[in-house]
């Protein structure tokens, strides 16, 4: 860090401040995400230091778009940031509330609020809508009904001031949740009457839980809040020994696992209960580069400067290779026999074409939930998929031979209840 930097550490993340402003976030290997700001002090760019960044665009002090950019140079010209694609766009109403979010292929979610700026409706890109009704206002607001545009979901909440809430589901079933004064769940009663209990210590850590069958699991912590013992009731207890904040030894009955770590906390040697040793090595960025197994075989991994896996040298001597596009998506894979598979993706990272080693291909189409609606196989046969009520759950599969399979979801949890197969 620079002499004028303030660094705050939290777990394996380090937050770097200069003049009271966050300028970068780093990990134990000093990989850094840099935050570049505009003249107004707003975060304008998130730069990973490897030629890739996210550009944040603003209007009226609100983020309206996020662009994925690549650092490029043409010929001998200086490097400049070029937008590879827009990832997401945002729209707001006159009160500054988010009302629409649109992804790279134009699929949009929409939002509606009450006059207290509490959300009332969320409409998904696939067509389904969710609604909320509230009681009270401000930070005391709590949901009393949550329902959807499809009939299976309509849930009502009956709150009591002692931390107890009863959930009434659309199918007539009920669930009960009981919280303590610090809003921690201490009891849950399932629709079938099964009861779960939880207890906590004065620091908010879970110490005991009991399942509906009466089995009790207990947890024990050290002064730093690290789990040092787990007592699973009728099973053997497990203990954990720590060193510099990381687990060094695990004991369960007579079995013992031991771990050696580097300065960053990654495991460099693992010894199992049989005394078998596995070693691990890492590069300067913290990526795994080698695994040495107990039989003395070795698995090596090669990475590029952008953190992408380029090559695997397998223990049997075979080599796998990988290629990526400018958006970081894998576009080709070569197996240990030299056979190559090619992948094509849409703008939101959904696989749309797969070219197999023999040259045949499979193609896929999707709905806004990322679910397949059509699949063309190597012989040109097309299988279609339909989804009812604007949901992500398949309602009918249309096979290439003309047959079909129907699916029904009839309960409040949208679980599959019936399959009709021709």
Task: Please give the residue ranges for each predicted region.
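Extended charged/polar low-complexity repeat regions
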Residues: 1-422
């Amino acid at each position: 860090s620079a002499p004028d930097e303030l660094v705050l550490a939290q777990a394996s993340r380090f937050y770097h401040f200069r003049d009271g402003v966050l300028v970068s976030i780093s990990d134990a290997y000093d990989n850094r995400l840099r935050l570049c700001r505009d003249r107004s002090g707003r975060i304008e760019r998130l730069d990973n230091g490897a030629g890739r960044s996210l550009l944040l665009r603003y209007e009226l002090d609100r983020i309206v778009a996020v662009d994925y950019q690549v650092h490029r140079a043409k010929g001998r010209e200086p490097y400049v940031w070029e937008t590879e694609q827009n990832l997401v766009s945002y729209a707001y109403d006159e009160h500054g509330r988010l009302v629409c979010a649109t992804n790279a292929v134009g699929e949009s979610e929409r939002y509606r609020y009450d006059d207290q700026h509490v959300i009332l409706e969320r409409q998904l890109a696939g067509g389904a809508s969710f609604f909320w009704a509230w009681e009270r206002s401000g930070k005391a607001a709590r949901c009393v009904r949550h329902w959807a545009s499809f009939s299976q979901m309509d849930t009502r909440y009956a709150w009591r001031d002692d931390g107890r809430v009863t959930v009434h589901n659309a199918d007539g079933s009920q669930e009960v949740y009981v919280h303590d004064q610090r809003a921690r769940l201490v009891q849950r009663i399932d629709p079938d009457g099964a009861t779960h209990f939880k207890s906590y210590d004065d620091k908010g850590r879970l110490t005991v839980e009991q399942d509906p069958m009466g089995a009790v699991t207990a947890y024990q912590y050290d002064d730093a809040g690290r789990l040092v013992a787990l007592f699973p009731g009728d099973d053997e207890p497990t203990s954990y020994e720590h060193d510099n904040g990381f687990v060094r030894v695990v004991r369960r009955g007579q079995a013992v696992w031991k771990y050696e770590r580097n300065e960053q906390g990654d495991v460099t040697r693992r010894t199992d209960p049989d005394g078998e040793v596995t070693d691990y090595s890492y590069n300067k960025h913290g990526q795994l580069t080698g695994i040495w197994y107990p039989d003395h075989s070795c698995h090596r991994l090669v990475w590029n400067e952008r953190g992408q896996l380029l090559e695997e040298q397998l223990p049997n001597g075979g080599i796998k290779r990988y290629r990526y596009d400018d958006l970081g998506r894998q576009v080709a894979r070569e197996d240990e026999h030299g056979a190559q598979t090619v992948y094509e993706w849409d703008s939101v990272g959904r696989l749309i074409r797969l070219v197999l080693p023999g040259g045949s291909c499979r193609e896929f189409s999707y709905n806004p939930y990322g679910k397949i609606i059509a699949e063309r196989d190597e012989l040109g046969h097309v299988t279609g998929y339909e989804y009812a009520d604007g949901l992500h759950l398949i309602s009918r599969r249309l096979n290439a031979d003309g047959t079909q399979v129907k699916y029904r979801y009839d309960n409040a949890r949208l679980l599959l209840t019936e399959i009709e197969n021709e």
